[in-house]
Swiss-Prot record:
Molecular function via GO: class I DNA-(apurinic or apyrimidinic site) endonuclease activity; hydrolase activity, hydrolyzing N-glycosyl compounds
Lineage, top ranks: Archaea, Thermoproteota, Thermoprotei, Sulfolobales, Sulfolobaceae
Alphabetical keyword list: DNA damage, DNA repair, Glycosidase, Hydrolase, Lyase, Multifunctional enzyme
Protein name: 8-oxoguanine DNA glycosylase/AP lyase
Role summary: Catalyzes the excision of an oxidatively damaged form of guanine (7,8-dihydro-8-oxoguanine = 8-oxoG) from DNA. Also cleaves the DNA backbone at apurinic/apyrimidinic sites (AP sites).
GO biological process: base-excision repair
One Pfam family named in its UniProt record: Ogg-HhH
Length: 207
């Protein structure tokens, strides 16, 4: 089922094009890295489309606007959690902006799990968000376990009924290991497998 999708030339080309974009992000500057982090903050408990639209509404203001201005922009864009996420964006900016790439890239180059642990110190960033961020800046050895991935794993019989909102760290790692095994059987990294599963579940590769 998944193998045939992986072998589909058109889908594979689209996935690999997205992978190349992530690899380019790895070489990009601090602004790009913080933009990707902001996207992951916005994606938590929201759809990717809603988060991406909110990020585009904010534009360059993620780098300098105050909390009230960010909150008002998010609200005007009809983003649901405008109060909380405005606060998280400001907190992240104060905590890591200007040194995010400098601190995370050397860690991720050596140990992606260690880099993920460091990112968990940012308010609003959990296992999924940290994994998502690292994948989007060119690291592919971590799984991004959201409801679409959970649904896929449940449907193929890899896991039982699971509430994605109550996913503990240990269970996340357990599911990640299952996905890594599937990825290994398909001769790819788990972060790239994610894009194929996402396409299968949503018919898009925008994640």
């Amino acid at each position: 089922m998944l193998r045939s999708l992986v072998q589909n030339p058109k889908v594979r080309a689209r996935v690999l094009e997205r992978v190349d974009e992530f690899r380019l992000n790895n070489l990009s500057n601090e602004e790009v890295w913080f933009r990707e982090l902001t996207l992951c903050l916005l994606t938590a408990n929201s759809s990717f489309i809603s988060a991406y639209q909110a990020l585009n509404c904010l534009g360059q203001k993620i780098y300098y606007a105050n909390e009230e201005e960010i909150r008002n922009i998010l609200k005007s864009c009809k983003y649901r959690f405008y109060n909380l996420k405005a606060k998280y964006i400001i907190m992240a900016r104060e905590k890591v902006y200007g040194r995010l790439k400098e601190e995370i890239k050397p860690l991720a180059d050596e140990d992606q799990q260690l880099a993920r642990e460091r990112l968990l110190n940012i308010k609003g960033i959990g296992m999924k968000e940290a994994s998502h961020f690292l994948r989007n800046v060119g690291y592919f050895d971590l799984a991004i376990i959201d409801r679409h991935i959970i649904d896929f794993m449940r449907r193929i019989g890899a896991i039982g009924e699971t509430n994605v909102k109550q996913l503990s760290k240990s269970l996340y790692i357990s599911f990640e290991n299952i996905l890594k095994s599937i990825a290994s059987n398909l001769n790819m990294s788990v972060g790239i497998l994610d894009l194929f599963i996402w396409y299968k579940e949503t018919n898009t590769i925008v994640k």
